């Protein structure tokens, strides 16, 4: 449902841009059509969830009365507002960061020395990173929705050992996938930037910004773990600290370093939130980075993937003498994803970063293991 929502939303935005280019119209009409993509994507996501819900409950009459409001369930409204509100807050966390940017960055860029028009252009380039990050976070959100029921079940059963084990698996998987997505996207960003916008503007700024995928994914993982234990105050305080840091540093950093400073203020705000969440969490959970040398193996795997993509970039530069067409850039991006993904997966299998149970927790994890065993 999340992938379809993102696909439709981005598709509507592209249709709006193409319509403006070929058929004209005002920028306000174009913006209205582009904004409708969020509504269309949300409706499709609900329909997908409804379809699979009916499919799961096929042969059962439960779905006929599952939406009936019973007198004894009215007390759930408060829980829905608190727990659902916290989930919504963290789901929209980067959007709140973007809201701060919308009030701070453009004016700070003018104090940085840019003209009004140049500041608007630079802000537009900086905003390119937001949809890329949101798309990269789909995996993290999917993992959260997968592991949260299990964490809650073990917590309710007071099975501390199983709870800790599942929580650490969740954090290891999230950290690995989100880190790989961040580094891979950072390395392939020039080609992706050219594919989408036909220029290489802001590669350094966006390269820093996409690192927020990793930090935001880990933040959401910790928030899900805390929520499964009915702890809501800590994550709320952590979110407030992160937003405050972002608010206080955006203007100052942007005046000194331009949009690169705005990107670093986003990373700093996320780090502040993550720091508070880690401090509030149990040491028995935080030790996941040390077990079986997880952090060392992960950093080595990421370094090998980066090296392979640097070699790949060199080969592309020699073969094409630079990428000058969108079709070329798209092909190079897709091939780069395949190269980086293959190298990374092969490396983490070789280093035994995951246990068999952890592999089986991933989509297609069993297939990857079988393919590796055949070799």
Question: Language-model segments: what does each one mean?
Answer:
Residues 86, 93, 118-140, 171-173:
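Alpha-helical transmembrane segments of polytopic membrane transporters and translocases
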Residues 15-21, 40-69, 270-318, 342-359:
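C-terminal transmembrane helix end/exit motif
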Residues 129, 137-158:
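Helix-loop junctions and terminal segments of transmembrane helices
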Residues 164-215:
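Alpha-helical transmembrane segments of multi-pass membrane transport and lipid-handling proteins
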Residues 1, 211-241:
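Membrane-interface junctions at transmembrane-helix termini in multi-pass inner-membrane proteins
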Residues 7-48, 233, 243-275, 289-290, ...:
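Membrane-interface helix-loop junctions in multi-pass transport and translocation proteins
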Residues 1-92, 96:
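Hydrophobic transmembrane helix module of multi-pass membrane transport proteins
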Residues 313-375:
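Membrane-proximal transmembrane or re-entrant/amphipathic helices at the cytosolic face
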